[in-house]
């Protein structure tokens, strides 16, 4: 939740899951990790579904930060959703109302626009899998990167590495255009959207029948399997990138979505890798009590301690792993980057929305409260740095990626670029049914006072300066839990320190 001024954030929220309590010293609830302009949550929960949507649409269409930038047609979106909710209300169909709102939010290509999930309803639509995980390759082809050996797909002869040719009679990528991606988080870039469509075409209601045509790479034989979706606890998504490789415990617990991966006990982790290369993982730019002590340790202090360890070890290079980084505070992000900069450098101008006037403004003065700089600090690491990034590196995590990319000694590496969502989040609305809708109302501006990082026409975020292709080989390795990106970063640094 990117924020214009750390001193403003005094809100705390305790999360408890399986005996672990999270004390969040900044606001993160449902407003995906961007700047929070202090505006109260608007409660529409006592209104009818149709009235609540009208209230929501009136507000979000006025406040959303990137209407012109992204070309959002609010009239078309509003009319389409209103018709669905009218029908849902007439038939008292709560699920149809919820799905209509999810489709409404998902139509906006922004990772900061979010309709909170109701997992029990989501599972009615995408709770079933077909026994294999489809992976989109860099060349546009699709393979099964993993196959459940107990599934009908496996019994029909499908194996990991097989090319997926057709789905229900259509070319696979064409069929993927119909995937129920409204139950996933929003995609700000086409790169991210295309990957999600392919992954979610193999999700459906339990009991759904489907036909898949696939090809073995070794004999070029074409095979057909008739499959039925079964409850699989979402394993086909877990076996794909990034879930198969990169843990995501903070996001899962914040968003209240199922998660079976490794838990986290610290926001920052440090270790020395082969060749005396330092590795620092940062899960987010915020303070969280992950060990239920009753207080949240300083993530910034932990980060600076990790950099100090790298300096003390005279590390030959440093890998900053910000894949799946959930974001956090602008102030903390700029402060972290100070450990790599030797000169004061602009981080951003904040073009903040004022709900009283309905306008945005950024101060004309260089040292205003809405202007953030990267201030050099000690310890400072000046060796080569590679930031590992992916499409779940969101908001302030993207600010870290941008800062590393802009260093002469810095690179970004990954299969994909970052999320492309760097706006300043505004208020949220509580809707009938207990879920919320949130959106960004402010903009992050670069030195030219133009919008930075937020996607436009399907392109945005921080791209890898060292891009790793998603080949069939890499997709198969990823499904087995092998960290191809980290290995590539190590190889790069060992050959070009």
Regions found by a protein language model. Name each.
Residues 1-38:
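Gram-positive cell-envelope targeting signals
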Residues 36-166, 171-173, 201-220, 224-237, ...:
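Terminal targeting/pro-maturation regions of precursor/exported proteins
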Residues 89-93, 163-213, 332-334, 420-423, ...:
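PDZ domains, with a preference for the canonical peptide-binding region formed by the helix
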Residues 114-116, 192-196, 250:
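Short Pro/Gly-enriched beta-strand edge/turn motifs at strand-loop
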Residues 171, 180, 187-189, 451-466:
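A recognition module on extended beta-rich or small alphabeta surfaces enriched in W/G with H and D/E
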Residues 208-209, 213-429:
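Cleft-lining beta-strand/loop regions that shape enzyme active-site pockets
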Residues 425-451:
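C-terminal "exit" segments of structured domains
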């Amino acid at each position: 939740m990117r924020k214009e001024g750390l001193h403003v954030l005094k809100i705390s929220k305790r999360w408890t899951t399986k005996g672990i309590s999270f004390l969040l010293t900044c606001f993160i609830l449902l407003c995906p990790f961007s700047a929070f302009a202090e505006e109260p949550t608007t409660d529409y929960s006592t209104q009818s579904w149709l009235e609540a949507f009208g209230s929501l649409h009136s507000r979000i269409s006025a406040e959303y930060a990137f209407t012109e930038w992204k070309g959002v047609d609010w009239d078309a979106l509003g009319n389409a959703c209103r018709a669905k909710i009218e029908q849902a209300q007439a038939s008292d169909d709560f699920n149809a109302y919820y799905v209509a709102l999810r489709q409404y939010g998902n139509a906006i290509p922004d990772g900061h626009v979010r309709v909170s999930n109701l997992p029990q309803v989501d599972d009615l639509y995408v709770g079933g899998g077909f026994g294999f995980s489809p992976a989109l390759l860099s060349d546009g082809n699709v393979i099964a990167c993993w196959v459940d050996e107990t599934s009908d797909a496996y019994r029909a002869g499908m194996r990991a590495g097989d090319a997926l040719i057709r789905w229900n009679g259509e070319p696979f990528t064409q069929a993927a255009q119909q995937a129920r991606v409204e139950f996933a988080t929003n995609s700000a870039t086409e790169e991210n959207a295309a990957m999600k469509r392919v992954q979610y075409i193999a999700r459906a209601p339990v009991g759904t029948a489907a036909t898949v045509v696939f090809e073995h790479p070794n004999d070029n034989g074409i095979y057909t399997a008739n499959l039925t979706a079964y409850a699989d606890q979402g394993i086909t998504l877990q076996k794909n990138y990034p879930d198969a490789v990169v843990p995501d415990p903070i996001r899962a617990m914040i968003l209240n979505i199922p998660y079976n991966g490794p838990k986290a006990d610290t926001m920052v982790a440090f270790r020395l890798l082969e060749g005396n290369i330092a590795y620092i993982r940062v899960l987010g730019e915020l303070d969280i009590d992950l060990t239920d002590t009753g207080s949240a340790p300083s993530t910034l202090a932990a980060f600076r301690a990790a950099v100090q360890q790298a300096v003390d070890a005279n590390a030959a290079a440093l890998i900053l792993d910000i894949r799946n980084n959930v974001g956090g505070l602008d102030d903390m992000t700029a402060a972290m980057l100070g450990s790599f900069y030797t000169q004061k450098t602009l981080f951003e101008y904040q073009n903040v929305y004022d709900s009283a006037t309905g306008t945005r403004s950024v101060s004309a003065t260089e040292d205003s409260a809405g202007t953030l700089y990267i201030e050099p600090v000690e310890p400072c690491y000046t060796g080569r740095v590679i930031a590992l990034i992916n499409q779940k590196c969101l908001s302030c995590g993207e600010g870290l990626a941008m800062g590393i990319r802009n260093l002469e000694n810095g690179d970004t590496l990954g299969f994909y670029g970052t999320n492309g969502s760097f706006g300043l989040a505004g208020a949220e609305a509580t809707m009938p049914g207990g879920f919320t809708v949130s959106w960004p109302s402010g903009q992050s501006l670069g030195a030219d006072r133009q919008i930075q990082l937020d996607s436009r026409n399907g392109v945005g975020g921080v791209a890898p300066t060292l891009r790793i292709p998603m080949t069939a080989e890499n997709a198969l390795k990823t499904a087995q839990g092998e960290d191809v990106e980290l290995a590539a970063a190590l190889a790069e640094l060992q050959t070009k320190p």
